[in-house]
């Protein structure tokens, strides 16, 4: 939202995560919309940004589902080192940290960023 997006929708199954998004938006002085159900959202997004969905193999079908709601998807993940998907390309490896510091092992501070685009 701070980068100029017309609309930003924060979506998570966990109501506590949504509350965290609300608090973060307030701290940053931006307005967001919120959703607890990704699949109830229409196909209208230019970009879907997700993090930490690869840790559970049951989430892998979401990778294709993201492209049913948005033109592009960015996936950030620090857990899975051998991720491969025909639509997703690894853009790079980034250093990250959680704030406040949750004392995560250093290996989880390396985040891989993947990109996919809906076929035209």
Positions of the model-derived regions?
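S-adenosylmethionine-dependent methyltransferases
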Residues: 1-120
